[in-house]
């Protein structure tokens, strides 16, 4: 349950059952004070936060996610503060095409602090609304075209900041063999791991597979349900729904799909 737009519930931990004959009720997890010390998995921290200094709050989230795979976080949006939003802006590609509002990265940055302050207020007061995605296409070769969703700069800023928060949780869940769309990892890292595996073990075959139109066919409701296993902050879930349902603008025509996510 949410207490209101201005406040999230405290994070909740689903604790393991006690010894036989006793059952533990779900416990309430409260973030310790910023000065609390603890051992850190430095390698994973570097992967998770390599492009942003680790804030004490997100580090505590990461540690809680690492300690309990069934921890459900109900207080996350407050981590998206002005500082993180400004960092997210500088993490974006400078030369990316403008979205439906025609605003470029450079134009948004002319009054960056003022824009981010206003965005922060709308975000935490429930006034933020995602703009439709502008549809573009890129050549895949052989005459095939890949649809590309071009998001407005301000939406990109919020999304990039939210990714940083969610990565503190999900980087503790992902398998070491996973390389796609993860911070500090690339296709070259995957190839290096493959080369090591081939050289170390006897390999008879390699499977190269691809899911056709993967992003275009994702079931949005199932995606939300999967996220809700870990994320219990209703405001974060509402943000995800707004982005999924923001719609697409192509050749002046607006449409909303109940499946798929913009690329």
Set out the residue ranges of the language-model regions.
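Nucleotide/phosphate-binding loop and acidic/charged catalytic motifs
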Residues: 162
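Short loop/hinge segments at the start of secondary-structure elements
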Residues: 155
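Phosphate/adenylate-binding "loop-and-lid" substructures adjacent to NTP/NAD/dNTP-binding pockets
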Residues: 83-93, 102-145
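Conserved polymerase palm-domain catalytic core
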Residues: 115, 122-137, 141-142, 165, ...
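Conserved phosphate-binding loops in nucleotide/dinucleotide-binding enzymes
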Residues: 147-152
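Catalytic-loop motifs flanking and including active-site residues across diverse enzymes
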Residues: 158
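Non-catalytic, polymerase-adjacent accessory regions of viral genome-replication enzymes
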Residues: 1-102, 106-113
């Amino acid at each position: 349950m949410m207490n209101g737009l201005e406040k999230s519930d405290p994070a909740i931990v689903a604790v393991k059952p006690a010894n036989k004959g006793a059952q533990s009720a779900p416990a309430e997890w409260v973030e310790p004070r910023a000065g609390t010390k603890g051992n850190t998995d430095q390698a994973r921290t570097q992967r998770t936060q390599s492009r942003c200094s680790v804030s004490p709050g997100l580090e505590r989230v990461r540690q809680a996610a690492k300690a309990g795979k069934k921890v459900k976080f109900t207080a996350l949006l407050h981590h998206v503060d002005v500082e993180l939003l400004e960092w997210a802006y500088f993490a974006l590609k400078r030369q990316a095409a403008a979205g439906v509002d025609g605003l470029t990265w450079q134009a948004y940055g002319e009054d960056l602090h003022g824009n981010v302050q206003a965005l922060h207020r709308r975000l935490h007061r429930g006034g933020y609304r995602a703009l439709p995605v502008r549809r573009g296409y890129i050549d895949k070769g052989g005459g095939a075209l890949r649809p590309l969703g071009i998001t407005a700069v301000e939406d990109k800023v919020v999304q990039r900041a939210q990714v940083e928060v969610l990565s503190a949780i999900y980087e503790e869940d992902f398998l070491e063999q996973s390389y796609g769309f993860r911070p500090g990892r690339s296709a070259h890292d995957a190839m290096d791991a493959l080369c090591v595996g081939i050289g170390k073990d006897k390999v008879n075959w390699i499977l190269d597979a691809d899911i056709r139109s993967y992003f275009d066919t994702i079931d949005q409701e199932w995606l939300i349900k999967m996220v809700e296993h870990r994320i219990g902050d209703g405001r974060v879930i509402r943000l995800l729904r707004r982005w999924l349902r923001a719609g697409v603008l192509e050749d002046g025509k607006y449409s909303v799909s109940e499946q798929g996510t913009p690329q």
